[in-house]
Structures are given as C-alpha cells and as structure tokens.
Amino acid sequence: GAVGEIQILLNNIASQLNGDQKKADKV
C-alpha cells in the first residue's frame, strides 16, 4: 500500500543519513 511505500522511502532516507553520519565519523 501507499503507507508501506512511504515507510520504505523513509527507511531509505534514514539509512542514507546514517551512512553519511558514519562517513563523517570516520573522517
């Protein structure tokens, strides 16, 4: 459903933000 798709998009954005934070921590 639409709600599920939105949740997936939010999860993808969250994972991308987490990845950016991890990269920043490494620097």
UniProtKB/Swiss-Prot annotation:
Q: Which domain of life is it from?
A: Eukaryota
Primary localization: other
What is its subcellular localisation? Trichocyst
> GO CC terms for this protein?
trichocyst
The UniProt similarity line reads:
Belongs to the TMP family.
The function of this protein is: Structural protein that crystallize inside the trichocyst matrix.
* The protein's name in its UniProt record: Trichocyst matrix protein T4-C
**Which organism's genome codes for this protein?**
Paramecium tetraurelia
